[in-house]
């Protein structure tokens, strides 16, 4: 496997970052998880736009243009001869000293990893619980910044692991259900698709936005509003979305069974629509 690291492609064993890099020392950096389907990088421009917005919010000046960064992603796939892949694109503050002062850091560290990952969208559902870990409020760490600091989600995932379930759902400081550890939450109630609004403590997921667009194209009413535990427990359908997850039905939440552990009709329709567009809404890797 070849890794892009600061302008060069190196073997996996040679892809090394300094122990003084602030991405390692302090989680001081940003990233994107991206998918490629059959030689098309899905929603690549949108991922790059979000990466640069996150970096700008943290005062990290990325030394590449957006067009150059797109080329980094495409070339990483080409040198590894990949068509279906998961891509991790990371930009850190760079190498500094052991202090927090970002002015002591040099230029940002940039690396891109691509691993084989076939399309998912199976029919298997997952089990989830709500956990005691609360999602950080917007005035503490804005979720619009997709930073390297995922400790909040890691702690939630640990609780899910101990409970023997697949995923953890986090509440905000007011008790509303907002997110999974790395995914957005949707419910269906009486034919209406509902999801938490972006003004709550959620990442404005790219797959989330795609699902909302697909639903509206299908004539499905979409409402963005705060969701309570009661809303989830009484939902007709429940699913999560994310770059790696795609669209995954949730069959059980806190022991309550959803839709007799069957994929709901709206969930099924959205999964089918997503499968149709995932090789159309993106940038081609290879000239064919």
UniProtKB/Swiss-Prot annotation:
The keyword Amino-acid biosynthesis applies. It catalyses: L-leucine + 2-oxoglutarate = 4-methyl-2-oxopentanoate + L-glutamate; L-isoleucine + 2-oxoglutarate = (S)-3-methyl-2-oxopentanoate + L-glutamate; L-valine + 2-oxoglutarate = 3-methyl-2-oxobutanoate + L-glutamate. It holds the Pfam family Aminotran_4. Acts on leucine, isoleucine and valine. It is an enzyme of class 2 (transferase). This is Putative branched-chain-amino-acid aminotransferase. One of its GO terms (molecular function) is L-valine-2-oxoglutarate transaminase activity. Its EC number is 2.6.1.42. InterPro entries: Aminotrans_IV, Aminotrans_IV_CS, Aminotransferase-like, B_amino_transI, BCAT-like_C, BCAT-like_N, Class-IV_PLP-Dep_Aminotrnsfr. Belongs to the class-IV pyridoxal-phosphate-dependent aminotransferase family. Its cofactor is pyridoxal 5'-phosphate. The modification N6-(pyridoxal phosphate)lysine is found at residue 146. SUPFAM superfamilies: D-aminoacid aminotransferase-like PLP-dependent enzymes. Pathway: Amino-acid biosynthesis; L-isoleucine biosynthesis; L-isoleucine from 2-oxobutanoate: step 4/4; Amino-acid biosynthesis; L-leucine biosynthesis; L-leucine from 3-methyl-2-oxobutanoate: step 4/4; Amino-acid biosynthesis; L-valine biosynthesis; L-valine from pyruvate: step 4/4. It comes from the Archaea. The keyword Amino-acid biosynthesis applies. It comes from Methanocaldococcus jannaschii (strain ATCC 43067 / DSM 2661 / JAL-1 / JCM 10045 / NBRC 100440).
